Amino acid sequence: VVIVAVLLLTACQLITANDSRGTQKHRALRSDTKLSMSTRCKGKGASCRRTSYDCCTGSCRSGRCG
């Protein structure tokens, strides 16, 4: 019984993996969105330091988030 259950779960995972392939087209955008929602970050134009990585855009130039 355990072997049958393991085989069924494995088959379901393989089918799900094949169905979801290629559905995430904009990975970089999704990562930025996830970062801005999960942490407190500074908006565009806010003061920043290159070493703190606290801009929502991920870019700190000349002391301002870009």
Curated annotation (Swiss-Prot):
Record PTM Cysteine amide, positions in chain: C65
Residue span(s) of the pro-peptide: 18-40
One function term, GO molecular function aspect: ion channel inhibitor activity
Localization (cell): Secreted
SUPFAM superfamilies: omega toxin-like (SSF57059)
GO cellular component annotations of the record: extracellular region
Span of the signal peptide: 1-17
Disulfide bonds: C41-C56, C48-C60, C55-C65
Tissue expression from the record: Expressed by the venom duct.
Keyword annotations from UniProtKB, A to Z: Amidation, Disulfide bond, Knottin, Secreted, Signal
InterPro entries: Conotoxin, Conotoxin_omega-typ_CS
Chief location of this protein within or outside the cell: secreted
Keyword Secreted: yes
Pfam families linked to this entry: Conotoxin
Family: Belongs to the conotoxin O1 superfamily.
Described function: Omega-conotoxins act at presynaptic membranes, they bind and block voltage-gated calcium channels. This toxin blocks N-type calcium channels (Cav2.2/CACNA1B). It shows a higher potency when Cav2.2/CACNA1B is only expressed with the ancillary subunit CACNB3 (IC(50)=0.12 nM) than on Cav2.2/CACNA1B expressed with the ancillary subunits CACNA2D1 and CACNB3 (IC(50)=2.6 nM). The Cav2.2/CACNA1B block by this toxin is voltage-independent, whereas the recovery from toxin block is voltage-dependent.
Extra remark: Negative results: does not show effect on Cav1.2/CACNA1C, Cav1.3/CACNA1D, and Cav2.3/CACNA1E and shows a very little inhibition on Cav2.1/CACNA1A.
Entry comment, domain topic: The presence of a 'disulfide through disulfide knot' structurally defines this protein as a knottin. The cysteine framework is VI/VII (C-C-CC-C-C).
Record's protein name: Omega conotoxin-CVIE
Organism of this sequence: Conus catus (Cat cone)
Taxonomic lineage: Eukaryota, Metazoa, Spiralia, Lophotrochozoa, Mollusca
